[in-house]
Amino acid sequence: MRNILCVTLIALLGGCTSTSVTEKYQDKRNDIINVKDKVIEFETGNVLIGSVSRLYMSNKCLLIADHKSVDKQIHIFNKNDFSYLTSIGNFGEGPEEITVMGCLAIDEAHHQLYVSDHAKQKIFSYDMDSVMVDSLYKPQVKTAMNETLFPSEYQYINDTLSIAVLIKPTSTSTFNQFLGRWNMNTGEMIPMKYTHPDIQKKRIT
């Protein structure tokens, strides 16, 4: 019995002095918040919005990106009273049309809306003041994206700094994903050194 206790004590002491090299990261949360009472329903009128849509917010506007639309892909509403303002982003393969819409980013300082097109590997720029008054407004190309490493989503801060989710294709059906900094002016992308183990080799479907 004494020998068993001694061995157990040595094992415990050894465990206390050893340094763990296991990486720790948060996988699940137990916090549940009921937001039912905070949901506000508003009428979209004649604007039809598909099931694959994302919401974006600017200082004055609520923008809804409808990724399944075959007409106008971005619908703009007043943020305060939810009144409809206009729709932009024609679907298509023409020079000023969006073929495969990605994420939207907003430059509040210069009233610009940036829209990614992953088919053309370009980011288009819309002047928010102009689209409100000109129904024939045509966007400009802000920048081209690199096919070997490009942002799938990003938080725009200024032309030289965005925090982006970067995609690096590894085959026709797989890619690696990183969080990093992106300079929109120069195209420079600096991935973070650490990558989460659950975002490796995701399959494109």
Identify the role of each PLM range:
Residues I40-Q73:
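Beta-strand-rich domains and repeat architectures in extracellular enzymes and scaffolds
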Residues S51-Y56, C103-A109, F150-L161, T205:
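Structural signature of eukaryotic scaffold interfaces centered on beta-propeller domains
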Residues M57-H67, H111-D117, F124, D159-S173, ...:
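Short beta-strand elements that form the blades of beta-propeller/WD-repeat-like
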Residues V70-H75, Q121-D127, S171-G180:
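Structural motif
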Residues K120, M128-T160, A164-T170:
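Asp-box/WD-like beta-propeller blade repeats and closely related beta-sheet repeat scaffolds
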